[in-house]
Design a protein with these regions (language model features):
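Bacterial N-terminal signal peptides
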Residues: 9-17
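Catalytic-core segments of hydrolase enzymes
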Residues: 219, 249, 253, 258-348, ...
Length: 416
């Protein structure tokens, strides 16, 4: 850079930037192919924190956010502050024990799986040779229900590959069991397999109240139940406090594509219409990766991202009567619904849990996508929508606000 150009750039920086805050600001930037991030960082007085491989997308700590003219002069194509993303909350009714003689995937016979005819689809496809990335919190690799269902993933929190280490049982999450009455309608199913609800004295070591530690295991358990021959790639982006950010999630989406995922489940959301998320989703779609996301648990039609982004299979929650779950989001951006009330799934430490939330509806759709993707490489979303059951009549207050309806796995995989 000549002395004259440097002077002009410095003048622009002084003229168009806001006053420097006390603390640096995390800024995501995508630069043009001809720009150099080292030079960009130097001109902004910034520190380079991280880079997304093969994307020209970088995370900087900047003293000030450059104005649009300044950014343009440096070759920055777009930029946004790296905002935080919090793990969605969910209702947890109970933690269950199941006798060791019971098969690890006993919960695939639960009422919600019967409603969507998941078992009826397995003679036609089991998800063989399909990798499903699950962008989530930590997963219990040693859980009986997940053994043989997990492939190598990556832990973006600790920045190292994720492998076969089981969770420390002394740190697994536990919520109050006072509402076990909600399980009454499922007692018959539980009794078939000898499942029992832990009381507080039995579960005394399960003291962590943060759901982030169990969320990844619960979602993986749902995927494994629906597509048992698929391989789940756990990508941890949420720490044990349930915190992540836009940059880390965008990095994980691209990692999934570059490491062979054909389906990606995203059971989280943010109100931020993020350019980085949109860029990552478009990258995945261009690679023919099926992207599934939970619609959110705020009982609103306000869009949640990435679910509301074009091409993402946004999934709401319904109950066993095909009524919209009281907590579930709805709206014009929805693709389908799936059961999300009182779902049985794997829980860290070899236990099982009963949970509610759109977080557990999305993995049902992701598992269904894996079954279809095992049979054919195109038309996955069309197969899911065409096979879905219209539930407008059961939800008169949400007509055309619940997408194509509630999924029917058997019909999506092998139409009558």
């Amino acid at each position: 850079m000549t002395r004259r150009n440097f002077s002009l750039t410095l003048i622009l920086l002084l003229a168009f930037s806001v006053s420097a805050p006390a603390n640096p600001l995390p800024l995501i930037v995508q630069i043009s192919p001809t720009a150099n991030i080292t030079n960009v960082a130097a001109m902004l007085g910034a520190t380079l924190v991280d880079t997304i491989p093969r994307a020209n997308i970088h995370l900087l700590n900047v003293p000030v956010v450059p104005s649009s003219p300044m950014a343009y002069s440096l070759g920055i194509e777009w930029m946004e502050l790296n905002t935080g993303v919090t793990m969605p909350g969910f209702v947890q009714v109970g933690i269950l024990t199941v006798p060791g003689t019971t098969v690890s995937d006993w919960y695939k016979y639960q009422p919600s799986m019967q409603l969507i005819r998941a078992g009826a689809a397995l003679p036609y496809s089991t998800g063989q040779a399909v990798v499903v990335a699950d962008i989530n919190s930590q997963v219990d690799y040693g859980h009986p229900a997940l053994r043989g269902h997990l492939t190598s993933g990556y832990d973006f929190v600790t920045a190292r590959p994720a492998g076969s280490t089981a969770l420390n049982q002394a740190e697994t999450g536990f919520l109050d069991q006072a509402e076990t009455g909600f399980l009454d309608s499922e007692r018959g199913f539980m009794n078939q397999f000898g499942a029992g609800v832990l009381d507080r004295s039995q579960a005394g070591f399960l003291y962590s109240l943060n759901p982030a530690y169990s969320h990844g295991t619960l979602c993986a358990g749902v995927i494994a139940a629906i597509a048992p021959a698929s391989m789940i790639m756990p990508l941890r982006v949420f720490d044990d406090a349930g915190r992540s950010d836009i940059f880390t999630i965008a990095k994980a989406i691209r990692y999934a594509v570059q490491h062979g995922a054909q389906v990606t489940n995203m059971s989280f959301g943010t109100l931020t219409a993020s350019p980085a998320l949109r860029n990552a989703i478009n990258y995945a779609r261009n690679a023919d990766v099926v992207m599934v996301a939970s619609a959110g648990n705020n009982n609103t039609s306000n869009p949640q991202y990435p679910a509301a982004l074009s091409g993402v299979l946004a999934t709401a929650a319904t109950d066993l009567l095909d009524w919209k779950a009281s907590f579930s989001n709805y709206g014009s951006s929805l693709f389908v619904t799936a059961p999300g009330v009182k779902i049985f799934s794997a829980y860290p430490g070899g236990y099982y849990s009963v949970v509610s939330g759109t977080s557990f509806s999305a993995p049902m759709v992701a598992g269904t996508a894996a079954l279809i993707r095992s049979l054919r490489t195109t038309g996955v979303s069309t197969s899911i929508s065409a096979g879905s059951v219209n539930i407008n009549s059961r939800n008169p207050g949400y007509v055309n606000q619940l997408g194509y309806g509630r999924i029917d796995v058997r019909q999506a995989v092998h139409p009558n």
